[in-house]
Amino acid sequence: MTRIRFTAAYDGRPYLGWQSQPGGRTVQDVLERAFSGLFGTTCRIHGSGRTDAGVHALGQVFHADAPDTHRIPADKWPAALNTRLPRTIRITHAEYVPPGFHARFSATGKTYRYCISRAPILNPFDAGLAWHRPLAWSVDILEQAVHLFRGTHDFTAFAALRGNEPRPIPEGYFRRTITQTQVAQTGEHVFITFTGTGFLYKMVRLMTGAAHEAARGKITLEELARLINAPLPDDKSPFCAPPDGLTLMRVHYPEETFGDKKKIN
Amino acid sequence: MTRIRFTAAYDGRPYLGWQSQPGGRTVQDVLERAFSGLFGTTCRIHGSGRTDAGVHALGQVFHADAPDTHRIPADKWPAALNTRLPRTIRITHAEYVPPGFHARFSATGKTYRYCISRAPILNPFDAGLAWHRPLAWSVDILEQAVHLFRGTHDFTAFAALRGNEPRPIPEGYFRRTITQTQVAQTGEHVFITFTGTGFLYKMVRLMTGAAHEAARGKITLEELARLINAPLPDDKSPFCAPPDGLTLMRVHYPEETFGDKKKIN
């Protein structure tokens, strides 16, 4: 067996999220069926993490182990798989990696982008791809709010619980570091970009929702700063933005080991 | 009854085209159900023309007659209807017009845009929105080819037959005038824009297909020019581009009567 690291882009609208489910209508299920068809045997793939139903990706990463009978040049893998995939899922890159590589455990960070549309009437081509916020709000305050998330914080107020957390929840369980934030405006769209070492369940959507509540004047920047820097046990983000606008842009790995262009094997 | 002119945008992917069909899965059917629900009585709408299955619109125009019980300000019509429509169809503009206005017969021209993607791997968000032509071809020759269509020509070679044409086909039946053409490139996308006084069935897709055959060297510009300017009875465009990349951008009406901003009534 040889381990391969794949990069995938997908339109999340037709799928029930990344993670395999009994009904088989998830991105992982569709990818595993393509691999299994190609290999003639059941194949499991391992993603860098889940994306929720309706969330998109331009740079999701996963790994799979290919039988030695399928040792083709790395740059032939995308086409070999894309012919077996619906057009809403594309493999954009593949490279052979050492057996110690793991898409989830080797990752050092992720970049997400959230798209908000300010159009008076949502463009039908943005349906499911942008959060429609046509009423008055301030992009300037949104930007100030988003930058408050930078740094290492206890993100308790910006984490939804999956229900499988250890009890009592250990000290530092919700601590994460946001290394970069950016707000950019292009026509009717406002794009928020978050890069961090790790993200909690629904964290980007809860940060975006809270920042937008500040931008439309429902909470102050001071109140938001307290949620971020000194949360009380019951503090919660005032709003969770919908999945529509969210795209996983990139998963980061240590450059020295897995450069985008460098062939390991 | 009061006549209203509506402008609509739609993502054509989920629909079997504009024109009403028994199954009810067309844009016209969905719109008529929204009007009928609002009026409490069956309502027919009249489009500027058909768009085929999978073809999109940013500026389709149609008219409808509203009962006098529904005389609301023109700028309230889009929201009143959009709440009853799927997000892939949006009413973007409405205005009251004189009873003599007809979306089809009053139109003086249309503008269509065709989108080609040159990306090595088609972006999953472009699936159904662009024609994927990743192999080598010349945007420069495409542009020269597209401009050959300007002017008044017998477009016999660029018309698909619907089967309901008069026989024998009258002299001049396929004569049309293309008033403007444009080719623009943005990143991986090449956009071709055609404005004309009228378009035959599949004409934009047949022009685009032929221009692309020239751009990839399958026919010469001289051969294309002959198809346009001196077609023989059996001449046909060498290729019909798929519906995916096609968008009806605008329907033109005499400015003096129906300006976009001018309220008639």
Swiss-Prot record, chains A, B:
The keyword Membrane does not apply. Disulfide bonds: none annotated. Gene3D superfamilies: Pseudouridine synthase I, catalytic domain, C-terminal subdomain, Pseudouridine synthase I, catalytic domain, N-terminal subdomain. One of its GO terms (biological process) is tRNA pseudouridine synthesis. Homodimer. HAMAP family: TruA. This is tRNA pseudouridine synthase A. It comes from Akkermansia muciniphila (strain ATCC BAA-835 / DSM 22959 / JCM 33894 / BCRC 81048 / CCUG 64013 / CIP 107961 / Muc). The gene is truA.
